Amino acid sequence: MKILVLEHELPNATAEQFQQFAVAEARKAWDLHQTGIIRELYFRADQNEAILVLERASVNEAQEALSTLPFVQNKLITFEVIPLKAYSGFERLFAKD
């Protein structure tokens, strides 16, 4: 299942805390990418938050993988996890009237 993930910084997180765990976060994100869990990873252009595309069997599996990230473990960020399905709108082009 393809899963869209939106990062949200928690209000009490400080720049110093992010700096403290930045290398460990990048290393873990790299590991998740190399194992195929994180398929795509971006920063938003309008703010300093990440957008991820994960491939997992379920939302629960995605949340388990995300919980291994140091920023999550140290309560600096949270994620909005959105399961996706294939777009079926093109079927309308071929429907018999």
Where do the model's predicted regions map?
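Conserved, structured core segments of small domains
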Residues: M1-D97
